[in-house]
Amino acid sequence: MSFLGGFFGPICEIDVVLNDGETRKMAEMKTEDGKVEKHYLFYDGESVSGKVNLAFKQPGKRLEHQGIRIEFVGQIELFNDKSNTHEFVNLVKELALPGELTQSRSYDFEFMQVEKPYESYIGANVRLRYFLKVTIVRRLTDLVKEYDLIVHQLATYPDVNNSIKMEVGIEDCLHIEFEYNKSKYHLKDVIVGKIYFLLVRIKIQHMELQLIKKEITGIGPSTTTETETIAKYEIMDGAPVKGESIPIRLFLAGYDPTPTMRDVNKKFSVRYFLNLVLVDEEDRRYFKQQEIILWRKAPEKLRKQRTNFHQRFESPESQASAEQPEM
């Protein structure tokens, strides 16, 4: 099964074939323009091996070169600064010394137990990608072709996963208690909780729970935060009464979130918040945010193979904000 192929003019076609391409799983990823691409899926520590095939399209042609190489690259690109591209992994295998190609050739390559410290990611302002890069070095213009891979970071957590329970309110007007069953959720998990009204002296017209994603790029004064509402869950439509308790069930599997990503190579972070929103009869909106951790659960087969694998995140911190009076 061919991995990908590309034409470099009428002379030579470059093709990369992975050794386990027929059995390796593939994963999908949305590009910055909203299209969905499918590439081979790898995990941290897995080897990457295969063949680079160079096929001449026209018999009798020659291709002089200054060397042929393949690279395994991990790269972070900030969209608002295309010149600021950072490579956190760059492994090189020389395939051929300077010479001349007169016929089709194949070259074996292998990158052993490659460290892939971060998850592949494409967001509003940043892209983290892994790719194989084949270069035929020439005097004037190199022939270069890139082949994307997708990397997933797997995480396991100890049995302790504390629930979130808070009482919030507006003095003498509204007092509620909310509870979520966990503070850490895997990407296919269900957020279960409840809202309990202790005091209601303002007329609430609408109440919903939002899952908010915040992508933070840059450092210091150049920091940019992009906020996106991933999911909305209507808790109630109408006025609650004192003592009323309303259950919450939000299924994450339907929204395809990414894992939480903390200070990735000091370039960006991706964080998730549960945002409780109340709207009163005068259309004033009240918010209460609570950070949660999202993590990628290993498939059952891999969980058995990776019993020593463990990934930790720092504890989430609660944040609160409001356009109108804070709860």
From Swiss-Prot:
UniProt xrefs under Pfam families: Vps26
GO biological process: endocytic recycling; intracellular protein transport; retrograde transport, endosome to Golgi
Span list, region Disordered: 306-327
Keyword Protein biosynthesis recorded: no
Principal localisation: cytoplasm
UniProt membrane topology term: Peripheral membrane protein
Keywords for this protein: Cytoplasm, Endosome, Membrane, Phosphoprotein, Protein transport, Transport
Superkingdom of this protein's organism: Eukaryota
Family membership noted in the UniProt record: Belongs to the VPS26 family.
Name this protein carries in UniProt: Vacuolar protein sorting-associated protein 26A
Source organism: Bos taurus (Bovine)
